Structure formats: structure tokens, C-alpha cells
């Protein structure tokens, strides 16, 4: 199959089987572009089923990985070796294959009992501006752990919050919209026909959908999500 078809300056429609590779190429180029002008680059990653294969493909990209610092967009309040841990998924697909130094990985500490303190401590670890961010989107339009109708969507001061989500395990830690909207490069990666209507609404600017509020994001979709 061919490469991505760019339908607008901000939306890329990619064959389903090529989605992981094309997302990895997008991230690698964004990292390289940033490293051309600064010594280190920050990369913030999401959990979910769609990003995992993209991280495996990213691990195969030739980059000066010793100059990349890895952060997390959100995390469940579970231990790092738990099956539901975003850290565990990223560790399995990207961190372990690359053998990144622990000093380059800034994990959200989901095992902590004081959730508010864990969120505050993570906010203190974040750089002033994230360079490259990969997001996903659920069928309900949530992104990171920012859910429709949740008060966290209106947060303007705190950079990281502990929130309760609609699915178990309910407690999550998440970056807030000001952090996501200030990032230099953002990609929202979506696949599947079940998300087609939500993608359409988000791209039309339906601000009841958290993903629509990340107005600086590019989108990478497979044909099903794009309605093709």
C-alpha cells in the first residue's frame, strides 16, 4: 500500500496496516526537527490499543535516543507492573527495546496512595513546554484522561490532575489541556469505524468532546475512522 494521503494540512489518512509505521515516522521527524535546534527533546506518550504498535515501530527508528526524555500523558493509579499500566505498555513496546536510561524516563507514579500529591509531584517534573505529544481518542471523545463533562476540562492552573474516569480502574492521573495545548507538536492517532462519528464531530469543533479542545493537534486516521 502507499503512504499517507494528506487530506488537509492537519489531517493524514493512512492505510490501516501502515498506521503504526506512519505514526512512528511522524514522531521520529518531529523529534529530529526539534533536536536540530536544541540539545534535548521531550516526548509525551499515551496508553491505549492504537499507540502500542506505533511505539514498537518507533523503537526501530534511528535517532539519538540518548537525547530524548520520555513523559506520560496519563496513567491509571495502579502499580507500574499492572496489566492496566500505561507505563508497562510503553516499557514493553519502546523503553525496553531501546534500553533507555532510567534517567530519561519520567513515569507517573500510579502506585502512590496520595493521588493529589502524586499529581503535584509529576507537574514539578514536567518541562515548561512539551516538544512532541502523542494522543489517542476514545469513542466518547476523551483524550488523555480528560473525559466529556468532567470539571478537569476547565482547569487552567494545575498542569496535572488526579481524576475519576468512567471505566475501571477509575482513578487516573492526567496532563491538563493547558499542557497539551502549549505543546510544540501534537498528533492524535485514531483507528476504527466506531470512532468515525466522533472524529467528524471533533474536527468540526464540537467542544463537548475533549479531543476537539486540543486545537493544536494534527490528526492521523485510518480509513475507517476517517469515514472512507
Feature-to-residue mapping (PLM):
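SAM-dependent methyltransferases
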Residues: 2-10, 14, 21-23, 28, ...
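Conserved phosphate- and dinucleotide-binding cores of soluble alpha/beta proteins
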Residues: 19, 78-228
